[in-house]
Design a protein with these regions (language model features):
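Acidic, mature catalytic/reactive cores of soluble proteins
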Residues: 1-201
């Protein structure tokens, strides 16, 4: 390789995932951007951010910042596929505006009966985990309740979480915060180009 270019790519990769989050593939095709957060000087009030105090933590970030820092996700993590295109374009309104803030991704179980069977096969007392997945949840919430209740599993924890996510739909989330914006077309187009570079068909 080219040492200087390799060093540049390594640093850009680090910078991107410290802002846009590290794309972690779970449940076969679900993407959770770990450690995502708003970037900028933390001493400025408008750069406030919060990262969930849980396993598989995610944080909030501004639409533009997160979008621009995920523009190479597919080239570096092909398993991301069209997730970023789906997530960001889902927030664009008919008038071209999008909300300011991207919130951590959550999940909602589509087949609760199958999820209950999975829990029953995985643990003796399903109550605490069942209560978590009855509403929108994150992988960290499931992992946290298992740890807090010292639940003994009949399978690896990651296998259980993957199974729950396979039975769930992913819910991209955003928030108005200080307003709506409309100047992100180039960044949005970059998400499509990144996807097409790896999946041209």
């Amino acid at each position: 390789g080219l040492p200087l270019l390799d060093a540049y790519i390594r640093q850009s990769y680090l910078d991107n995932f410290l802002r846009g989050g590290y794309p972690f593939i779970m449940g076969g095709d679900k993407v959770v951007h770990l450690f995502s957060r708003k970037h900028g000087d933390p001493e400025r009030d408008y750069n406030w951010f919060a990262i969930a105090g849980e396993y598989y933590s995610q944080g909030n970030g501004n639409f533009r910042d997160v979008c621009q820092n995920r523009r190479c996700d597919v080239r570096l993590h092909p398993g991301v596929k069209d997730y970023n295109v789906w997530a960001f374009y889902s927030f664009v309104q008919a008038d071209g505006y999008n909300p300011l803030e991207i919130r951590p991704a959550a999940f909602r179980v589509r087949d609760m009966e199958a999820a209950r069977r999975l829990l029953a096969d995985s643990m003796y007392d399903t109550g605490a985990v069942a209560a978590v997945i009855e509403k929108d949840f994150t992988p960290g919430m499931v992992s946290g309740v298992i740890a807090a209740h010292e639940i003994v599993l009949a399978c690896p924890e990651q296998e259980l979480i993957d199974g729950l996510l396979r039975l769930s739909e992913q819910r991209a989330q955003a928030s108005f915060v200080e307003g709506y914006w409309s100047d992100h077309w180039d960044y949005l187009l970059d998400l499509i180009l990144d996807y097409l570079a790896v999946y041209p068909d």
